[in-house]
Amino acid sequence: VALGGCLPTVQLGR
């Protein structure tokens, strides 16, 4: 869960 554009973060860390 890293804010960069990973798998689950594509909805909140784009």
Swiss-Prot record:
EC code(s) of this entry: 1.11.1.7
Source species taxonomy: Eukaryota, Viridiplantae, Streptophyta, Embryophyta, Tracheophyta
Keywords: Calcium, Heme, Hydrogen peroxide, Iron, Metal-binding, Oxidoreductase, Peroxidase, Secreted
A Gene Ontology cellular-component term: extracellular region
Reactions catalysed: 2 a phenolic donor + H2O2 = 2 a phenolic radical donor + 2 H2O
Principal subcellular localisation of the protein: secreted
Cofactor note: Binds 2 calcium ions per subunit. Binds 1 heme b (iron(II)-protoporphyrin IX) group per subunit.
GO molecular function: lactoperoxidase activity; metal ion binding
Uppermost EC category: oxidoreductase
Cofactor(s) required, per the database record: Ca(2+); heme b
Protein's name according to its UniProt entry: Peroxidase 5
Family (UniProt): Belongs to the peroxidase family. Classical plant (class III) peroxidase subfamily.
Heme keyword on record: yes
Listed GO biological process terms: hydrogen peroxide catabolic process
Cell compartments where the protein resides: Secreted
Function summary: Removal of H(2)O(2), oxidation of toxic reductants, biosynthesis and degradation of lignin, suberization, auxin catabolism, response to environmental stresses such as wounding, pathogen attack and oxidative stress. These functions might be dependent on each isozyme/isoform in each plant tissue.
